[in-house]
Design a protein with these regions (language model features):
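Long, low-complexity serine/threonine/glycine- and acidic-rich segments characteristic of extracellular
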Residues: 241, 245-312
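Short, surface-exposed recognition loops and adjoining beta-strand edges that mediate ligand/DNA contacts
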Residues: 78-91, 95, 100, 109-124, ...
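C-terminal catalytic region of ATP-dependent kinase domains
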Residues: 103, 109, 119-224
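Conserved beta-strand and immediately adjacent loop positions that scaffold enzyme active sites
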Residues: 115, 127, 288
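Short secondary-structure boundary/capping segments
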Residues: 5-10, 117, 143-146
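Extracellular/luminal Pro/Thr/Ser-rich low-complexity repeat and linker "mucin-like" segments
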Residues: 153-154, 234-247
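Short, compositionally biased P/S/T/A/G/V-rich stretches that sit at domain boundaries
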Residues: 214-238, 311-314
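Internal "kinase-insert"/substrate-recognition segments embedded within catalytic cores
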Residues: 1-97, 101-102
Length: 314
């Protein structure tokens, strides 16, 4: 933990596993249920600790931040601001995108409430950490998100789903079918195991990339093919502030105005955005609206020209 996170051992690490209940006095009969993000109508950690196993700071036995999260999800009493304060949207969506793409059915974001770690750095936000991903690349028709309690409640919110779509699109366009980077990696792996009796089944993965592509595009849906477009008309105005509306495809992480760092972008759906607080000077304004990726690199740009007229005299 300390290798990957600053003071990582001071955070809360939970291992996700089945909950088991013994149903007979002799211990021979038992029942299990998947771990999930359900709230059990109790803030008592005993209700959660058998499927969310404490693996750091065990002596503290502090489940308060975890229970705060599942209570918000389970009661559906959260909005974008409050849930993003508790949960690391990007880390959760990256994990779900990868495990969904490779059809890792044996984990919590798909069909089994286990085989992952849930981690919260001290003073930070909850994230899923990959673990035990050996049931992969099998069923190209597998779902990308499962139906365990709380999973869809979180990931189907448009302000979360947009980021899941984005990271899945990153996989599709950069790291899977026809990816030079992945082809180079597979070649190096082939050379590394030569003569060992181990074979690198590159053809299996190439076939997977081809067969999984359409399913991934269908899961993303219309955002995969939405145009990058400004919908606001450029009629002359006397206002000093401007708001623009538009749409973007799933290749775009955020929207900005070149040179205007105070402008704020708000997403109203998985594709529609509103950019407010744009400052206008008197005369013609040549604005550049930029769609950027998670690294701030420009993916799309479109010019928007608008004239600000002089204010009318009182």
């Amino acid at each position: 933990m300390n290798r990957n996170f600053e003071n990582g051992s001071e955070g809360t690490l939970l291992r996700v596993d089945d909950e088991w209940r013994f149903t007979s006095d002799d211990g021979n009969a038992r029942q299990s249920r998947n771990a999930d993000w359900s709230y059990k109508n109790s803030d008592n950690p005993v209700q959660y600790h058998s499927e969310w196993l404490m693996r750091s700071r065990e002596q503290d036995y502090d489940y308060s931040n975890f229970i705060e999260f599942v209570k918000a999800i389970g009661t559906r009493k959260f909005d974008e601001e409050s849930i993003n304060r508790m949960a690391d949207r990007d880390m959760l969506c990256i994990n779900a995108a990868v495990r969904g793409y490779d059809a890792d059915w044996d984990t919590i974001t798909l069909n089994r409430g286990k085989n992952a770690y849930f981690y919260r750095p001290k003073g930070g936000k909850w994230m899923l950490i990959h673990w035990d991903g050996d049931r992969v690349f099998g069923n190209a028709g597998e779902t990308f998100l499962g139906g365990l309690s709380g999973i869809r409640t979180y990931f189907d919110k448009p302000y979360i789903r947009r980021h899941l779509n984005y990271y899945l699109t990153e996989l599709l366009t950069k790291l899977t079918k026809d990816s030079a980077l992945t082809e180079a990696w597979m070649q190096f792996e082939t050379e590394a195991v030569a003569g060992t009796g181990i074979s690198m089944t590159s053809s299996h993965y190439r076939n997977w990339f081809r067969s999984r592509e359409r399913a991934a595009q269908n899961f993303i849906g219309s955002p995969f093919r939405t145009d990058f477009k400004i919908n606001t008309r450029n009629s002359p105005t006397t206002n000093s502030d401007l708001t623009l509306n538009g749409t973007s495809p799933s290749t775009v992480y955020d929207i900005r105005i070149a040179g205007q760092f105070a402008a704020q972008c708000e997403w109203t759906s998985t594709t529609a955005w509103t950019l407010s607080g744009i400052k206008l000077k008197e005369g013609q304004n040549d604005l550049i609206v930029e769609g950027v990726n998670h690294e701030g690199k420009i993916v799309y740009s479109e010019e928007f020209k608008i004239t600000k007229r002089a204010d009318s005299p009182p």
